[in-house]
Amino acid sequence: MSKDSDNPGYESGYESDTEEKKQEQAVPAQPISSTANKDGNPDTSEFDPLANKEYTEEQKQKLEQEQKEYFSQTTPQELEADDGFSFTPASSTQSTPSISSLSGGISSDSQTSDPITKAVRETIIQPQKDEIAEQILKDLAALADRDLAEQKRKEIEEEKDKTLSAFFGNPANREFIDKALENPELKKKLESIEIAGYKNVLSTYSAANGYQGGFKPVQWENQISASDLRATVVRNDAGDELCTLNETTVKTKPFTVAKQDGTQVQINSYREIDFPIKLDKADGSMHLSMVALKADGTKPSKDKAVYFTAHYEEGPNGKPQLKEISSPKPLKFAGDGPDAVAYIEHGGEIYTLAVTRGKYKEMMREVELNQGQSVDLSQTIAEDLTKVQGRSQETPQPIITPNQELKSSIETPTTTQVPPITPANQPLQPETSQMPQPQQVNPNLLNAATALSTSMQDLLNYVNAGLTKEKDGNKQIDLINEAATAILNNEKSDIAEKQANIIALTENTVNNNDLTPDTKVAGVNAVLETIKNDQNTPDLEKSKMLEATVAIALNSENLEPKQKQQMLEKAVDVGLSLKDDASRVTAIDGITDAVIKSNLSTEDKGTMLIAVGDKVNASELSNAEKQKLLGSVLKKGVEAQVLSPEQQQLMQQNLDKITAEQTKNAQITEVQGILANPAFNTIAKTEAIQNVTTKVLDSPIKAEIKGETLESITKVVAESPLNGQDKADIVKGMGEAIASHKTMAPTEKISTIESVEKGVAESITDLEDKKLMTKGLVEGIYEGKANPEITSEKTKAVSRGIDKSTAIPEDKQALKDAANEAALDRETQNLTEGLKRQNLGEPKPRDDIYNKAQDVADALKNVITPVLDAHPEKREVSEEEEVVKKTSSILNDISKLAIEKVNNFRAMLSPDGNLKTLEEKKAESTKKVDELVKEFGTKSSTEEQQSFIKANLIDDKTLSKEIRLQTINKLLQEQAQKRAEAIENPNVKTEDVRVVSGVNIKDNIKIMGALMNARDSIIQSENLNKSTPIKRESSFPPR
């Protein structure tokens, strides 16, 4: 058991990582907590673990007896351990007991007035330190270096009967502490002290035993009937809420961790508790003590229970402050990510604690902030213990050192820093042999390496001394860069230690008050650049450094969002520059996670993720990798609900573009393979490329991207070594595939044809080949056999594609002439074939010009018939002279009438006539449709709307079929869109009426049904008319 405060050495929280990956979540136990107010702590006993502590012989004997009694006990029926809390009543004068929090502020002289904290120190922490010291003395007796052994023995003896804080706080003594902890007997003693100590403290300061504000079990309540989330509200005695604790059960896929003897233990379930960091609701002190769970997620018996405890002491403003953490040691984490759960080995068993790596680090930083001292999180004890297991992959944590302490250490008159691990009477000697020696060694870098050769703390002291002395920003950046280089080049450090030291340097840079914000950004970016250029660190390990660096930058309170984003973008650049794709994925995923889990506002998190996405999008990676990385960022952002709808849309658009580009490249490659295939003749190639064209048209990408894709495919065909006619045949096939496509809208077909012709015009090939391909495209359009008006628009699209190209003017005109020539040829062919197939007994398609011409013919017939009837003698054979005379008169009359009618016909066809052009007819039609839709919108009730549909869209035959069908389609689209938007974003919802966002779904369905019935009625009527042959009369009467 150790107290995790802000003191280096054994009191600190030692961590080590295992490589097992946490995959799901665990079963909760119940917490014990205590709370106290500022009037309830008259005790002024020692609090700081560095302060002196004396034990009487009677106290030692009593403690040993308690331990023996505990291990000699047998309990026929074991009771489960509970979580608990305790608090000091707001009006009480009694001290507050706590296992997991402090109820008194730590003053500058390291005093505390909290009896629970004092009890934990006296019954658990100090006895454990004494036992370790005894074991170290035994180990020293066998040490070969007798001078060193004697020196260390004196250090321990000088502190004997005290807290041994100086010895345990000296980094140079860690190897002796680690060796002692390898002793199995010592480990058993430490575990027994911990269990017996907790049992004693929990019993002594229990509310059930009459201690006011003492420990009592937490009453968890399920949240929203969910089995994996529980909560409880902790209040002081006045009923004021101190905090709400949330507990999440994590039922995970089984993963294994290793015990000290190498045995693998499977973890099936654990829990996470969201320990509060800041408390500002009510006054008082609070102690939260959470029992460690067994590997299967169940609670141990009370006689085997150990606890993770958070001590919250009343601060200057009366509000609880997180002052200290008590937890079993060595503390390890099942992974290197912030979500990795903490676990311990105790009594030969594995237990999980209700805290993750990320939460633990966050709590330790708050402890540091509230006590104003450094916190050593390097976890050397745990790391060395895992070496016994054969596991050296664990990642030690960084040394976190506040600037004020660093300044105090460098403002002394001494110019040379004397590291704590070096005897006070010996100067620090450079150990340059530890570092790789270039031909010319930078003296500053050598100094940094020298400082690092003793401890990371000395390197930070060295760096901060330089940053305080040097005011030039560029030189400050150089110094930070030198330190980063020294860390990564240190041959004595393994990867884990290098990572920890880089993180420590980054945090020191961000929090250093001697640096301007811009210099901080440049300094951190220099560290990132050093990581990028380092040749010894594997890329996967670099990606972890990047994630940690981003987390430090984003969570800093000393930087503005703009500066944080600059550091983020640099980290992303470095991540994208890593050599293997797995490391790049790990880096970007890690950076994304750091953004989501940061303390930024939701809006700022969204902005940061957009910056990550932009960097990925602008990179030179393959489209496939961009798609993977950007898709992961978008998915994580959406799941975490930190991206606004606009940001999601923007990122999705970028992703769509990448996907489309990837698809385009794949299809171009397919076409290149078809063209190069010697087994394919022209017909086979045409068919294959037609199929590719159809695939493009069928794909869900936007019409614009489809056009770009087919434009690129056309260029590939045009620039292939095929002869001109073969190219023309292939392009003809593409044109036919576009013109005859079943689902594309006419406007999309037209824009796609423009793109294909643009590809022809801009291709690098002979003009004659381009002309042949242009003609082929026009012929393909005609092969589509569309409505003549639509075909005409498509042929015009060919000319527009030529205009939009970068071809020279002379080539553009030549290509337009070729297009017009091909269109004229096809129109002539169609006319000839139409005349050959003409059958007056069958109905013909009628356009306006045909109708007007028929009117003229009918008018001529109506004139000729009366004239002939007025001269019946013309039907008889009469004298030749009379016949000629009368015939001449009749023909003269007919001629006059014909001229009159022709002139009238010409007038109608003139610009001033009343024959409307296609564009004018479309405009009138659109206007009428809009008027009908608008009028429909004024009908408020379902009945009025249904009546409108019947009267105007079914019964009113004065309106053309086209206008009525267009109106129906537009109204159907509006109704469908209303319902889709309403269901997607339900602002108003009642289950009985099914009204969503103000849209009555039942009425909506009725109206859509009426519209579809009207459409079917019109179509059926039209089909009926077409199926009835119309017998046409000749324009002229029989002779």
From Swiss-Prot:
Alphabetical UniProt keywords: Cytoplasm
Source superkingdom: Bacteria
Gene Ontology cellular component list: cytoplasm
Coiled coil regions in record: none
Keyword Cytoplasm in annotation: yes
Subcellular location: Cytoplasm
Biased composition range(s): Polar residues: 31-44, 424-438
Biased segments, Low complexity type: 85-114
Chief localization: cytoplasm
Region (Disordered): 1-115, 408-438, 1020-1039
Amino acid composition bias (Basic and acidic residues), ranges on this chain: 54-69, 1030-1039
InterPro entries on file: Rickettsia_antigen_120kDa
Pfam families referenced in this protein's UniProt entry, alphabetically: 120_Rick_ant
Name recorded for this polypeptide: Antigenic heat-stable 120 kDa protein
